[in-house]
Structure formats: C-alpha cells, structure tokens
C-alpha cells in the first residue's frame, strides 16, 4: 500500500459524494469518497493511500489525461516477472510502488532510471487518519 502525507485544503460534498483536495508538497491531489471520514477536516494532515495495483504508468508526454493524481518520477527499481512486474520510484522522499503487467513494461520499454509518470484515479485514493 502506498501512503503519502498530505494536508486537506478543501472539501466539497454534494449528494453524498465528497471531493477532497489535498496539498502534497505544493501539488494538488484529489480523493473522491462516498462517505466522508469523521477525521477529514480542512487544514488537517492525513495519509492518502492507494494500492500498487491502482497505479498506472506512462512514459513520455501525458498532458491530456483524465487522472487527477499525477506523480512525475524516475524508476528506481524494476523487477520483471513472467506475468506481473513491480516498479518503484521516489517522489518528494516518499516511495511509490506500482504493479503492472510485464507486457506493459516491455511495450513501454521501461528501464531503471527512466523518467515516468505515475497516475492514480481520485476514486482509488483513500484517507487515513494520522494519530
């Protein structure tokens, strides 16, 4: 599970759905929730969490994309398996991991130290209270 510390900057709720904007090192990230956690208040620090299997990977220019959460990084580790592969990168001193198909690794011709973008849909982000 990926966990990044961020601060809630804005909460918008309509018809039971909440859009939570978060400041992560000056970058705005978004989480969409069906139930607003009781600890979620504007100005509070939280962990944003998302599974490695929910992290998409792109190489090259990705200006027109619907994903709300984009992390520009360089691949640090790449472990190719027969069907699935894992890769990780550091973004603002936080390790982010991704699990994608080995076919995708080969199609994108990914290698360690390559610049990439990690993508996470806002609906795949959960919040965790910092205690």
For the regions a language model picked out, list residue spans one by one.
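Internal alpha/beta loop-helix hairpins
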Residues: 1-17, 21-28, 56-58, 131
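Acidic- and glycine-rich mobile interface elements
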Residues: 90-110
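Short, surface-exposed charged micro-motifs
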Residues: 10, 77, 88, 117
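Short, acidic/hydrophobic/Gly-rich beta-strand patch recurrent on exposed beta strands
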Residues: 19-25, 30-32, 86-92, 99
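A generic beta-sheet turn/junction motif
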Residues: 15, 24-26, 50, 82, ...
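Glycine/charge-rich catalytic "coupling/switch" loops of P-loop NTPases
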Residues: 2-5, 35-74, 103-131
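Short, conserved beta-turn/loop elements at beta-strand boundaries and strand-helix junctions
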Residues: 11-16, 78-84
């Amino acid at each position: 599970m990926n966990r990044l510390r961020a601060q809630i900057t804005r909460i918008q709720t309509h018809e039971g759905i909440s859009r939570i904007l978060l400041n992560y090192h000056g970058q705005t990230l978004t989480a969409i929730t069906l139930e607003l956690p009781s600890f979620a208040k504007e100005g509070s620090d939280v962990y944003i969490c998302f599974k490695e299997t929910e992290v998409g990977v792109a190489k090259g220019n990705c200006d027109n994309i619907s994903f709300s959460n984009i992390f520009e990084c360089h691949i640090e580790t790449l472990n190719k398996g027969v069907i699935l592969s894992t890769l990780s990168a550091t973004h603002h001193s936080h390790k982010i991991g991704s699990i994608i198909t080995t076919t995708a690794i080969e199609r994108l011709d990914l290698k360690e130290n390559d610049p990439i973008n990690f993508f996470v849909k806002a609906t795949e982000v959960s919040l965790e209270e910092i205690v």
